[in-house]
Amino acid sequence: MRDRAHADTLLFALGNAGRQDDGLGWAFAEAAEARGFPPENIHLRYHLQVEDAERIASAGRVIFVDACREPLPGGFEVRPCEPSASFPFTTHAVSPEAILFVCGEIYGRCPEATWVLITGESWDLGEGLSDTAAKNLDRANSAFTSTPR
């Protein structure tokens, strides 16, 4: 069943499923689609690019999901994501905050944004999540499904 509540929400899942727990973002997106999140609103990325700002600027809301190395309470964290003019000296690591800043500067609007970070522990080449990452993913998915729309 299609989830109409998320019709104007974009989900940007960041990571690399070929590097174990770095695939947490993509696994979260897969679960969201299974729950009815519109597949055309799900974007899998190895990393964000400045070009993503155009698509993001037209959304009502955007959710960024990524793995992190930091041990977070409960294994994951959901936090507001605000625009920031801080850009690294590489296009390989453009942050969600920087993309939101570009949205505001170029397109004159910036959607409400949330960042979901999920703790992982294994980053070697290979597919599949560690047991710890899989548990943290389950916790994050549970919070996502119980969050009011």
Where do the protein language model's features map onto the residues?
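N-terminal catalytic or cofactor-binding beta/alpha core of small enzyme domains
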Residues: 1-120, 127-139, 143-149
